[in-house]
């Protein structure tokens, strides 16, 4: 698939033709994206950097200052200022979120919140990471919300550190079009189009289309990729009490699979950041995803309403890759494994919520009673060579490409089916102007069937396992509004996550269980222009899978881990012209029990200290009127580079980015972004010493934005 920036440019110019936009006002009079704080909705746009409402923490439209739990919101404006194509960059400003395995650069397969790694993230409250979905594209995202602490009482299976929920762009009442085209270092080209229009005079029928086209060679040798995204959405106000929203997204992604660089003898920095250890003639991995989502809302009366929503996604991934396997004793001979993957998955989720808003005497209750059903199918085929038999080696100092492909010696075929049902109960309680509480519980029933066929050394081995797990995950929280500017809160909650597979006796493993405790303060500063949340936390997780010392080759649920610390996040307007967003986290995360890893070992990719700050200044006078300029600083401390307590570490780093925008006309803006200004050599993440992802060198992006 070869995609061209001219495709979206052509569509954008066509959509801006006088015939199509004959009914619009002049561009100078259209201020369509300005949204006041009073009009903000939990799923809508945010003015500036500070969000006031969220639905991620309660599945209801609630003021953030009334939620007795830490939640960070990174709004669309941050993504626009950074000119970021992926949402991972936004997570740097959430506080306590770090990067983990990205599956060769293809996905947001895993990330880390408050010390614990998770593969769960959500899209409008639906699980979005079943299978191997492409890394989320920023073109469709209105805001990125990070709920800190266990979220199983709302979302079901997950990890105790926290959860990311992506809120997508919805059709708006105003008519507008935004065309954005950028070009940058390493022949990186990207164009997006955001087109919104009412379809009738009354504004009951609204339509929005988001398009993105991307073509990039990247700073890594031979590791280029292309992406095409089409995301239409449609809303219909059927009557004053009933609305329907339908959203779809189609993504076509082709990218070279890249496990990154290596660390000879556990030392980094001796190799060029650009050096690639795969094979240029392997081709690209194709990852095609389709998502369809529909939400029907109906107000029964002034107190009660219904929400029925369904979400379906499908994905297919296939392609060849030569991947880093292990380093020989000499430290420069890299054994490699040649793989072919063919994965396909389907996931469907349906939710039915009954929401109530009523009083018992002087006490207000916002009630949520919800049912959820999910069915998931996943089929995986992996063919791989065997490095111990065919090393397929390459010299990391002077790589010579074009070796004959080794034969496949192992054939893995896996089939997984999951049926999950859940009941949610929640009560948001407003006792008076000072005190608020939150009670919630979720009852989950999870059934998993797995079948695996493995051909190894010419012999087939078939295995199957089945497990049914039930879990009740409660949550309780309280908030005291000491003054209009200061709110104190505390909460406790539980999480669970099923463990796949069976032990030596063929018995399904007990699920991982997590507990979280949090206390903090929420501040409303500078007459409401700046919001801040400071929270301390203590998290535990048990039933972590670890090797069974009595039965080599098998596992048992004997592992435990603990994470504790505090994090800070703030955002808003320091002055009318200066917007800020920033975060800091101190995280002490370690293994507390394991059969193979020493107690006290640090958890993978978790820095003890991390922080970020971005500020943008808007000019209001003179020849710079309408322009802005800003900078972003990101610090990440030392991290364990693998999970085996080998002593391999990723060094700390600090990066500085610059940005500026200048209005060429009333509807045209020129932008420039310089990332990693001082060209620091750094490493974003690793899995071990042969899977290490280097960060981007200094790079420049120029952009042009047209608004109609």
UniProtKB/Swiss-Prot annotation:
Subcellular location, record wording: Cell outer membrane
Annotated signal sequence range: 1-21
Residues in TBDR beta-barrel domain copies: 174-708
Protein function: Transports the metallophore pseudopaline, which is involved in the acquisition of nickel and zinc, and thus enables bacterial growth inside the host, where metal access is limited. Is probably involved in the import of pseudopaline-metal complexes.
Major localisation: membrane
Annotated InterPro entries: Plug_dom (IPR012910), Plug_dom_sf (IPR037066), TonB-dep_rcpt-like (IPR039426), TonB-dep_rcpt_b-brl (IPR000531), TonB_rcpt_b-brl_sf (IPR036942), TonB_sidphr_rcpt (IPR010105)
Induction: Is part of the operon cntOLMI that is negatively regulated by zinc level through the Zur repressor, which leads to transcriptional activation of this operon under zinc depletion.
KO phenotype (gene knockout): Deletion mutant does not show growth defect in LB medium, but it exhibits an evident growth defect after treatment with airway mucus secretions (AMS). Disruption of the gene alters the intracellular zinc content in VB-MM medium supplemented with zinc. Mutation severely affect the ability of P.aeruginosa to cause acute lung and systemic infections in C57BL/6 mice. Mutant shows a small decrease in the extracellular content of pseudopaline and is partially impaired in nickel accumulation.
Organism (species): Pseudomonas aeruginosa (strain UCBPP-PA14)
GO process terms (BP): nickel cation transport; zinc ion transport
UniProtKB keywords: Cell outer membrane, Ion transport, Membrane, Nickel, Nickel transport, Receptor, Signal, TonB box, Transmembrane, Transmembrane beta strand, Transport, Zinc, Zinc transport
CDD domains named in the record: ligand_gated_channel
Domain TBDR plug, first and last residues per copy: 63-169
UniProt record similarity statement: Belongs to the TonB-dependent receptor family.
Record-level GO cellular component terms: cell outer membrane
Membrane association type: Multi-pass membrane protein
Source species, domain of life: Bacteria
Protein name per its UniProtKB record: Metal-pseudopaline receptor CntO
Molecular function via GO: siderophore uptake transmembrane transporter activity; signaling receptor activity
């Amino acid at each position: 698939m070869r995609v061209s920036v001219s495709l979206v440019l052509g569509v954008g110019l066509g959509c801006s033709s006088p015939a199509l936009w004959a009914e619009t006002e002049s561009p100078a009079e259209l201020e369509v994206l300005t949204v006041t704080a009073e009009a903000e909705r939990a799923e809508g746009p945010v003015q500036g950097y500070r969000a006031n409402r969220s639905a991620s923490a309660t599945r209801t439209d609630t003021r953030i200052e009334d939620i007795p739990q830490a939640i960070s919101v990174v709004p669309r404006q941050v993504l626009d200022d950074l000119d970021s194509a992926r949402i991972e960059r936004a997570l740097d400003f959430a506080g306590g979120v770090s990067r983990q395995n990205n599956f060769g650069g293809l996905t947001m397969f895993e990330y880390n919140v408050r010390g614990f790694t998770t593969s769960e993230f959500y899209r409008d409250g639906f699980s979005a990471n079943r299978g191997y979905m492409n890394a989320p594209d920023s073109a469709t995202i209105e805001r990125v919300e990070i709920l800190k602490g266990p979220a199983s009482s709302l979302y079901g299976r997950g990890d105790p550190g926290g959860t990311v929920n992506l809120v997508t762009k919805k059709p708006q009442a105003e008519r507008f079009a935004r065309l954005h085209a950028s070009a940058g270092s390493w022949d990186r080209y990207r164009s997006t189009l955001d087109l919104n229009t009412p379809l009738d005079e009354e504004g009951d029928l609204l339509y929005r289309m988001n398009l993105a086209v991307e073509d990039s060679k990247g700073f890594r040798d031979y590791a280029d990729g292309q992406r095409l995204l089409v995301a239409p959405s449609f809303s219909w106000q059927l009557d004053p009490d009933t609305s329907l929203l339908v959203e779809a997204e189609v993504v076509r992604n082709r990218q070279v699979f890249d496990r990154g660089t290596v660390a000879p003898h556990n030392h980094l920095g001796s190799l060029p950041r650009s050096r690639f250890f795969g094979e240029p003639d392997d081709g690209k991995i194709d990852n095609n995803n389709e998502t369809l989502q529909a939400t029907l809302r109906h107000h029964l009366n002034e107190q009660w309403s219904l929400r029925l929503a369904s979400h379906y996604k499908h994905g297919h991934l296939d392609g060849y890759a030569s991947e880093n396997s292990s380093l020989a004793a000499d430290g420069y001979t890299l054994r490699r494994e040649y793989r072919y993957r063919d994965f396909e998955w389907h996931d469907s989720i349906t939710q039915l919520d009954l929401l109530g808003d009523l009083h018992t005497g002087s006490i207000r209750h916002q009630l949520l009673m919800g049912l959820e059903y999910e069915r998931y199918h996943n089929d995986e085929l992996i063919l791989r060579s065997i490095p111990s038999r065919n090393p397929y080696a390459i010299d990391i100092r002077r790589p010579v490409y074009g070796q004959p492909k080794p034969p496949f010696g192992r054939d893995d075929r896996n089939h997984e089916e999951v049926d999950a049902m859940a009941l949610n109960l929640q009560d948001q309680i407003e006792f008076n102007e000072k005190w608020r509480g939150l009670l919630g519980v979720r009852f989950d029933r999870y059934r998993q069937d797995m079948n695996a066929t493995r051909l190894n050394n010419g012999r087939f081995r078939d295995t199957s396992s089945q497990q049914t797990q039930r879990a009740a995950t409660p949550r309780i929280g309280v908030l005291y509004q000491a003054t209009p500017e200061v709110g104190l809160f505390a909460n406790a909650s539980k999480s669970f996550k099923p463990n796949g597979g069976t032990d030596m006796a063929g018995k399904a493993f007990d699920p991982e269980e997590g507990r979280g405790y949090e206390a903090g303060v929420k501040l409303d500063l500078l007459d409401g222009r700046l919001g801040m949340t400071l929270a301390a936390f203590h998290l535990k997780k048990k039933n972590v899978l670890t090797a069974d010392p009595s039965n080599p080759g098998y596992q048992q649920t004997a592992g435990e881990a603990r994470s504790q610390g505090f994090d800070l996040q703030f955002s808003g307007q320091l002055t009318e012209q200066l917007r800020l967003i920033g975060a800091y986290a101190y995280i002490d995360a370690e293994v507390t029990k394991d059969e193979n890893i020493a107690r006290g070992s640090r958890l993978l990719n978790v820095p003890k200290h991390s922080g970020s700050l971005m500020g943008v200044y808007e000019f209001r006078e003179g020849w710079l009127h309408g322009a802005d300029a800003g900078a972003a600083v990101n610090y990440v401390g030392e991290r364990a580079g693998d999970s085996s307590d080998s002593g391999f570490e990723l060094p700390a780093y600090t990066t500085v980015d610059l940005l500026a925008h200048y209005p060429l006309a009333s509807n045209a803006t020129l932008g420039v972004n310089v990332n990693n200004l001082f060209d620091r050599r750094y490493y974003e993440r690793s899995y071990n010493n042969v899977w290490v992802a280097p960060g981007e060198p200094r790079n420049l992006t120029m952009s042009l934005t047209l608004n109609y």
